[in-house]
């Protein structure tokens, strides 16, 4: 089974959840959830699972739980497939 690690730059507390594009090798995502008690992390996992059409359990936070720069493991997709699904402007 394929899996990859995705770098994400998170902006919590935004007015809405939004994919903002690529910043080098990281994708920038704005989330409406606040960075309190793991809410932004949960919102990020749910947002990416929906965008990538994967079950929630296929998206796992592996690094950066308390930081804005995060790394997530995506099971079942290669990095190329993830980039294609999220948009290739990066």
Label for each model-derived stretch:
Residues 1-46, 53-56, 60-66, 70-90:
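Contiguous, often N-terminal, cationic amphipathic patches that form binding interfaces
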């Amino acid at each position: 089974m394929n899996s990859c690690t995705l770098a994400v730059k998170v902006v919590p507390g935004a007015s809405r959840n939004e994919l903002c594009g690529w910043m080098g090798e990281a994708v920038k995502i704005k989330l409406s959830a606040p960075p309190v008690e793991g809410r932004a992390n949960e919102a990020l996992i749910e947002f990416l699972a929906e965008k990538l059409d994967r079950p929630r359990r296929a998206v796992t936070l592996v690094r950066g739980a308390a930081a804005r720069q995060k790394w997530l493991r995506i099971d079942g997709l290669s990095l190329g497939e993830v980039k294609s699904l999220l948009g290739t402007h990066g």
